[in-house]
Amino acid sequence: MQSQIVCHGCRSVLRYPSGAPSVCCALCQAITTVPPPAPVMEMAHLICGGCRTLLMYTRNADTVRCSCCSTVNLVRPVNNIAHVSCGQCRTTLMYPYGAPSVKCAICHYITNTGMNTVAPTPSPMPTSSGSSYNAPPSGSSYNAPPPTSAPTSRPQNVTVVVENPMTVDEKGKLVSNVVVGVTTGK
């Protein structure tokens, strides 16, 4: 597999085999050192409590802000995953064990999990489910729970891009479903 880097001498784009420690430019003979690969961050998913969008975030995050509806979702680990067949299209759905219902991403039908449930299976990598807090509009009589306190250290914002499965629009064309979110990690 090949990678690319910009020559530090003449600014040309150089191609080189992945894993090479340095690259010699054929034009200016400058040797450009290849930086070490970026550390791989473990990622997890949760469904936004405000708009039901699938969000991806780094595993060490305490909260995840949805870029679609600005809901701050609290992250809590879930150790078991259960399965249920969609009540409409019969697709097998995965959900955190103990959830009262699950919405099918294909047909949008909401299935109660108390029926047709397969026993939970231990998750090989813990996934996360989020609870959320939305600030009510000013002047509203909505009684929301108080927000949780923020971490004491300065969090670092990380932009996260999630590419969901493609769908077909009314004209029969494939549509990409990409969501961009911001997560606050430690």
Curated annotation (Swiss-Prot):
Region annotation (Disordered) ranges: 120-157
Q: What ranges does the record give for the region Putative zinc finger 1, renumbered to this chain?
A: 4-34
Region called Putative zinc finger 3, residue ranges? 83-113
One Pfam family, short name? zf-LSD1
In its keyword annotation, does this UniProt entry include Transmembrane helix? no
Q: Where in the cell is it found?
A: Nucleus
Q: What is its main location?
A: nucleus
For this UniProt record, the keywords arranged alphabetically read as follows: Nucleus
* Location of the region described as Putative zinc finger 2 in the Swiss-Prot/TrEMBL record: 45-75
Among InterPro entries, the record links this protein to: LSD1-like (IPR040319), Znf_LSD1 (IPR005735)
One Gene Ontology cellular component annotation held by this UniProt entry: nucleus
Q: Which domain of life is it from?
A: Eukaryota
**Bias regions of kind Polar residues — which residues?**
133-143
Q: List the disulfide bonds.
A: none
Q: Does the record carry Disulfide bond as a key word?
A: no
Instruction: Explain the purpose of this protein.
Output: Putative zinc finger that may be involved in programmed cell death and defense response.
What is this protein identified as? Answer: Protein LOL3
Native organism is Oryza sativa subsp. japonica
Its gene name is LOL3
